[in-house]
From Swiss-Prot:
It is an enzyme of class 4 (lyase). The active site is at 175 (proton acceptor), 212 (schiff-base intermediate with dihydroxyacetone-p). Pfam families: Glycolytic. Its EC number is 4.1.2.13. Belongs to the class I fructose-bisphosphate aldolase family. NCBIfam families: PRK05377.1. Coiled coil: none annotated. This is Fructose-bisphosphate aldolase class 1. It comes from the Bacteria. It comes from Staphylococcus epidermidis (strain ATCC 35984 / DSM 28319 / BCRC 17069 / CCUG 31568 / BM 3577 / RP62A). GO terms for biological process: glycolytic process. The gene is fda. Pathway: Carbohydrate degradation; glycolysis; D-glyceraldehyde 3-phosphate and glycerone phosphate from D-glucose: step 4/4. GO terms for molecular function: fructose-bisphosphate aldolase activity. It catalyses: beta-D-fructose 1,6-bisphosphate = D-glyceraldehyde 3-phosphate + dihydroxyacetone phosphate.
Length: 296
């Protein structure tokens, strides 16, 4: 593990850019960027277009390491190059800590939750991540209803994978998303917090994780998770809120920082001039940074 990057992730001021839309969500991400499905004829072309979009984001002067601590990448992005360097090296050289999305998507809903599908090639992926100088990983589950068994299963699966990831020298971001429209969202979050606390308490002193959570209904609910000795940082997802709404809610939560995807890229368009693009990205970065750093 890179100690300088760990120090930046633990104490740095800023947020994490989530650039990890995978195969399933790529057409939607491209469409929002202004690239329609008739502009590519196969998956390779689609992934090239999305890589071009991400390259435009990370090479922009607005994508500044003074405000962006880290970036989460999709596997395809990790294996591609930006300006002649693997993406992870490009980011690290720029001062942005690289993470890799390692999950294979969600299983069918059961007990009010969606566990992660099996990650059969996790070992090989983590070896490649180390070769590519990746600092940490991210994996997402989804909680839709108040079901204690389901929530327990989600957290147990996350920590089971997290321990394997830690053993490879990487820092896992554990992401048990709570659907923002869940009927008992506030209650779900209390159960989730208790289960996460159990998982954290089961770790050895040197086993470090990060948490990526939905912004809680009750402000500062997760503050003591952020203070847990095994937690590097707690970040939050935008989860379907608009950027303004997500920023507003985030400001009420001390110590939590953003890890936004759609809310970061929502004003970016393929048709923008470089100047327009940099300004739109800069405005988004500034507002998300402000919500992550300057609290109410």
């Amino acid at each position: 593990m890179n100690k300088e990057q760990l120090e930046k992730m633990t104490h740095g001021k800023g947020f994490i850019a989530a650039l990890d839309q995978s195969g399933g969500s790529t057409p939607k991400a491209l469409k929002e960027y202004g690239v329609n499905e008739d502009q590519y004829s196969n998956e390779d072309e689609m992934f090239q277009l999305v890589h071009d979009m991400r390259t435009r984001v990370v090479t922009s002067p607005s994508f500044s390491p003074d405000k962006i601590l880290g970036a989460i990448l999709f596997e395809q992005t990790m294996d591609r190059e930006v300006e002649g360097k693997y993406t992870g090296d490009y980011l690290a050289d720029k001062g942005v800590v690289p993470f890799l999305k390692v999950d294979k998507g969600l299983a069918e809903e059961k007990n009010g939750v969606q566990l992660m599908k099996p990650i059969d090639d996790l070992d090989a992926t983590l070896n490649r991540a180390n070769e590519r100088h990746i600092f940490g990983t991210k994996m997402r589950s989804n909680i839709l209803e108040l079901n204690e068994q389901g929530i327990k299963d989600v957290v147990e699966q996350q920590f089971e994978f997290a321990k394997k990831i830690i053993a490879k020298g990487l820092v896992p971001i554990i992401e048990p998303e709570v659907n923002i429209n869940a009927k008992d969202k506030s209650e779900i979050e209390k159960v989730l917090k208790a289960e996460i606390k159990k998982g954290l308490d089961s770790l050895n002193d040197d086993q470090l994780v990060m948490l990526k959570l939905t912004i809680p209904t009750e402000a500062n609910l997760y503050k003591d998770l952020a203070d847990h000795p095994n937690v590097v940082r707690v970040v939050v997802l935008s989860g379907g809120y608009s950027r303004d709404e997500a920023n507003k809610l985030l400001k009420d939560n001390d110590e939590l920082i953003a890890s936004f995807s759609r809310a970061l890229a929502s004003d970016l368009r393929a048709s923008q001039s470089q100047e327009e693009f940099d300004k739109a990205l800069g405005d988004a970065v500034d507002s998300i940074y402000d919500a992550s750093v300057n609290k109410n």
